[in-house]
Amino acid sequence: MSVAKKFAWGCLAVVLLLFGSAYMGWRWVSANLAPTLGAENIAEMQQLLIDIDIPSDFTPTFAMYTDENQQDALLIYIQEDKRTVLSQLILHQQSTQFSKEEAENRMGNSFPGLQITRLEFHDAEPVSFTVPVSFQEQPVSVNYEEGRASEEAELSHVYSAFFEYRGQYMSIMLAGDPKFLNRGQFEQLLKSIK
């Protein structure tokens, strides 16, 4: 066999290996980390996450696990009007304690919701306050931010709370248009947790 034929067969083998490994990698990601948009999966995840009263105008739209062991659940609800997203509610459970920045990094830049929870430009200093809740003695600490995800983006309000719940760590973020979002809504969400 000539050198040219050996080289051609070698190139073909490398290309086939690349395609094969890419396919196997894609299958692994889709099996372990892909969004579970089916209604049954979202309902199942709602039961696993937290016992909370979600307002009826919020629709569950995105569910997935953010780790390969399928233990850290993420669920995103949107409130929309005529196909315009007014606000998003993000419930995120993890087995270890984490911050807002870590939660955003864990979700990844490609997942929905981050464009309004990760504010690059703040119009005011972030504010903290506490909300008394029924599931524990201590009130839950809440952070409130007002700003924009980018210079061209609309003004967004972001409320976030991180707390321990039934042996897991929970993050609840409510973000969106300030005309449709207020502190009372977020307080009501936290107070509804059982």
Regions found by a protein language model. Give the residues of each.
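N-terminal targeting sequences that direct proteins away from the cytosol to non-cytosolic compartments
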Residues: 2-83, 113, 165-166, 173-194
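Conserved polar/disulfide-associated segments of primarily extracytoplasmic proteins
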Residues: 28-36, 65-171, 184
